[in-house]
Amino acid sequence: YENIKTAVSLNQLNSKVEPGDPKLLREDKEALLRHYIDYRASYGFCVKKYIAEAIFYAGTSAVGLITQVDGLKNLSGIKEPAIVTCNHFSPLDSAIVRFAMRKAGFTRISIVNQDTNLAMKGFVGYMQRYADTMPVSSLKWFMQTEFPNQIKSALDENKLVLIYPEQEMWFNYRKPRPCKRGAYLYAVKFNVPVISLFVEQQVKSTHLHTFRVHVLPVIYPDRQLDERTASVRMQHTDYEQKCAAYVMAYGKKLTYDFEEGDIVGR
């Protein structure tokens, strides 16, 4: 709570705020990513991936009991692979996204997460490593070759790829935050659309936290523009759509003046 409040006051809306997140040195990231690349083709990795995906499938069904999806008509005619973007407010919000996409007829989705998540402990760490995830990193060598190859491979398999353009998770934060350009750069590079989502968080009672997924208009890359211009245009369009969805969902103007109600449960 205090970290989010401070980040908002400093206008650092994409910064890391969760106190429990692993903090890794460069050499630690190197070791984690090298191990991930070597291990992912192993039998042990495949077994753990199978188990994690089975757990995630069951969890997605459970999340569906408290999740409503609006705007599925915006996805009519979308059969091809695509990149999905969504506001990031929980380590398990990917289950909400997966439920919404399942309702739209998509059954396969890969989830991009931070390389530091590979170092997480316990159940959440297990799911972050094995539940059809792929790490993104600040390391240049990884982002130049390995990461684009992972994205391309998933899209070639006709999967959706979930990328959080807000970059960092802010737990239970309601407002959309500015989008980084990466998701849209890959959409242009691989000529796939962006499925734009905004998740509204609702509190029905003290113990019941529910969700409404707003499926927004699909954003297509403009092939007449150069890569940078096209990706920036998609980036701005997506952020504007998410901001408009916030206003519609909560019935209030979007500002980044901090209020207690910006965080569910406060």
Which residues does each PLM region occupy?
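Structural motif corresponding to alpha-helix initiation and N-cap regions
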Residues: 69-72, 121, 145-148
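Membrane-anchoring hydrophobic helices of lipid-metabolizing enzymes
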Residues: 1-98, 130-131, 210, 264-266
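Catalytic core of membrane glycerolipid acyltransferases/transacylases, capturing the structured
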Residues: 78-140
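Non-catalytic C-terminal accessory region of glycerolipid acyltransferases
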Residues: 1-24, 145-266
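Short, flexible loop segments at the rims of nucleotide/cofactor-binding pockets, characterized by
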Residues: 59-65, 137-142, 172-174
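A generic secondary-structure micro-motif detector
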Residues: 45-46, 114, 172-173
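Short amphipathic alpha-helical segments and helix-helix/interface helices
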Residues: 56-57, 98, 125, 151, ...
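Soluble or luminal CAZymes and related metallo-dependent hydrolases
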Residues: 47-51, 142-146, 235
